[in-house]
Amino acid sequence: MQQSLITKWLSISCIMVIAMIVIGGITRLTGSGLSIVEWRPITGILPPLSFEAWQVEFAKYKAFPEYNYVNYRMTLSQFKFIYLLEFIHRLLGRITALIYIVPLIYFYFKGIIKNRDIAPYIIALLLLYVQGFMGWYMVKSGLLNNPSVSHLRLAFHLIIAVIIYHILFYQLIKNRCDILLILSQTDLKLPLRFSSVAITVIYLQIFLGALVAGLDAGLIYNSFPLMGDNFIPTAIKDNFFDLKNWYDPVFIQCIHRLGGYSVFLVVMALATYLLKIEHPKLNKIAYFLIIALLMQISTGIITLLYSVPIIIASTHQFFAIVLLSVIIWCYFLIKTSK
C-alpha cells in the first residue's frame, strides 16, 4: 500500500515535469517567454481578471525591449495570448512544486520514505528551487538591451528540468521493479557502458537542442542531410573550435546535427546488443529504443525541413524525454540484474 502511494506520487510528478518541459518549449517557440516582466512567486498565481488589469500588464510589457524592437505593433488581444502561455507555464511550475513537496513531507514524517532513501528526493527538491530561480534568471536576460533570452541560460534551465525528471523517474522504476532480472550467464558490462554513454549523449543533445531554440538556429539551413552544399558549412570550417561559435546559429545547428548522428549510432548499438541477449524484457526495451529513436530523428528532420512548426518541434522535444526514459529504464534493469 505504501509503495503504491509512492509510485502514484512519483508517476504524477514525472508527468508534471514532462508537461513543464513541453509547455516551456511551446512558450519559447511562440515567443511568449518575456510577456510577464515580473517575478512574483507568491502573488502571481492569478492572471489579470479585468480589462484594466490587462491594460496594466500590457503597459509593463511595453516598457521593455521586446515590445519596442520586435512586437511594437502588437494588440492587447495578441498580448493576452503570449501572456497566458507564459502564465500557464509558471502556474504549472508552482503546481508541480506543490505536488512534489507536500507528499514528500508527509511520506517522510510518516516513515514511508526512510532516512536511507531520502537523499535523491532532497536533491530533486533543491533542484526545484534552483529551477525556479533559473527560470527568472533566464527571463531577466531578455529584459535588458537585447530582446531575447540568453540561449545558454535557456539550455541550463531545460537541463535542470531534465535532471529533476531523471531523478524522479529513476526512483519510480526503482519502486515499481520488485523482481530483478536473472542474467548471471550474460556479460552485461558492455550494454551497461552503452547505456551510460547513451544517457550522456542524449543530455548533450538536449542541451544543444535548447541552444538551437534559443538562437533560432532551426530557421536556417532548412535542408537535410547537407547544410547548403556541404556537410559542415565553409563559414565555420576554418574556425570550428573557436569559443565564439557558441553564439553562432550556424555552428550550433551543425553540432546539433552531429549530435543526432552520435545518438543514432550509440542507441542503435545498444539496441542491437540487447536483442542478442535473448531476454524478453531486454528485447522489449530494445524495440522501444528503436521506435523512440526513429520518432526522435524523424520529428527532428521534419522540424528542420519545415522551419520549426510548433507542433512537430514540441513532439521532437517530447520524444527526447521518451528516449531518455527508455535508456534510464534499460540502465536500471541491467545495473540491478544478477
Curated annotation (Swiss-Prot):
Chief location of this protein within or outside the cell: membrane
Class of enzymatic activity (EC top level): oxidoreductase
One of the protein's GO biological processes: heme A biosynthetic process
Top-level taxon of the source organism: Bacteria
Cofactor: heme b
Signal peptide residues on this chain, from the entry's feature table: none
Binding sites annotated in the UniProt record for heme: 256, 316
Catalytic activities: Fe(II)-heme o + 2 A + H2O = Fe(II)-heme a + 2 AH2
Membrane topology: Multi-pass membrane protein
Protein name (Swiss-Prot/TrEMBL): Heme A synthase
